[in-house]
Amino acid sequence: MLKINFLGDSITEGCCTSGTQHTFVYLVGKMLNAETRNYGVGGTRIAPQTKKSLEPIWDLDFIQRAKKMNHDADYIFVFGGTNDYGHGDAPFGKIGDKTPDTFCGAVDYLINYLLQHYKKEQIIFIPPLHRANEDSPYGDGSRTSPANILKVYSDVLVDIVKSYDIKIFDMKEEMGPGENNPLFEDGLHPNDLGHQKMAELLVDYIKKL
C-alpha cells in the first residue's frame, strides 16, 4: 500500500472542514487506497518562532515535526509558508542561509533534513495558496512593522526547493483567490469543497509520479 506523509499547518490539519473525512489528506487516501498520515498542526510555521505563542503547540515548527514523522513513506508533501508570512517573527533572510534562524534558512535546513531520510524523488513541496490580504506587508495584521508580502515568501520557497532539484506542486491558481471564492471558508482556509478540489488535484498529480 502506498504511504504518504503530509507535513503542514491548519490547512493540512483540516481547519474549516466539517470533519476529518472531508480533509484533503483523508480524501487522497480514500481515492488512492493509500495510507495517508496527517502531520498538520494549525498555526505552525516552517521557521521557528522567536517569541512564544499563546499555545505551545503553535510553536512546533515544521523542522521539529519532520523529525517525528514516520520515515517509511513513499512520498512526503510539505505544505507551508502561509503562517511564516502571516505571523512568523523569524527574519526573512536570504537564499544561501543554512540555519533555521531565518525563513530562507529554515526552508533550506528542512530540505537537508528530509534528504537525509528520503530520496529527493520522494519529496514534494506545495507553495502557499492565495489568501485574503496577501499583498499586505503586515501579514495577518499581527506584525508591528512591515515585511515581505506572501508572494515573496512563496517565490523564495520555490527557488530554494528547485535549487535542490526537488519537485514543486503548485495548486494556488487552480484553487483561485482566497476572497469571494466558494472553495474557501474565511479567506485563508479551504472548506469541504476546497478540500475536495485539492484532493482531486493531488490525486491526479500523484498518479503521474
Give short role names for the model-derived ranges:
Residues 9-12, 191:
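Ser/Thr-glycine-rich phosphate-binding loops at phosphate-binding pockets of nucleotides
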Residues 7-8, 138:
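A short, surface-exposed helix-loop junction/capping segment
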Residues 10, 45-46, 182-183, 187:
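Residue-level preference for alpha-helix termini and adjacent loops
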Residues 2-5, 13-101, 105:
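Conserved SGNH/GDSL esterase-like catalytic core that processes O-acyl groups on lipids
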Residues 11, 42-45, 130, 175:
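Residue-level detector of flexible, active-site-proximal loop/helix-junction positions
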Residues 60-209:
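Alpha-helical cap/lid subdomain in secreted, periplasmic
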